[in-house]
Amino acid sequence: MSYSCPKPCRQLSGPFPIARSEWDMKQNAHFCPECQHDYVSANLKYPEPPPYVAQYQCVPCAPPPPPSPPKKLCHCTQSAAPPQPQIVVPPTHPHHAPPHPKPHVPVKPTTITKTVCHQVPVTYYH
């Protein structure tokens, strides 16, 4: 079976179908590489767009509430809950002055001399 694009660009060149996705294959939709258009080989109409997939698959709670109050959503608080205000912590220091570091006090190492194997003195810095 040969497929041809409804536009004039496919009338002269050889037919070859290109399905770009699984959705295109299910709809028997193909892509014309010359005019960069999608078409359906059965009736040469442009294919339907893929169905919208929501980011959050929320299921209403069971049992469903009566129709008058709004439905509650299970496992989906991002779209149902109002946004929380951010907690702002006032800075402890002015923005123009960095905090003062603690004064650096040099620490002298204490030396420990031990005698190990064959009476060789070894100095450890602690």
Curated annotation (Swiss-Prot):
Compositional bias (Basic residues): 93-105
Domain of life (superkingdom): Viruses
Signal sequence bounds: 1-28
Region (Disordered): 85-107
Alphabetic keyword roster: Signal
Protein name: Uncharacterized protein 119R
Organism for this UniProt entry: Invertebrate iridescent virus 3
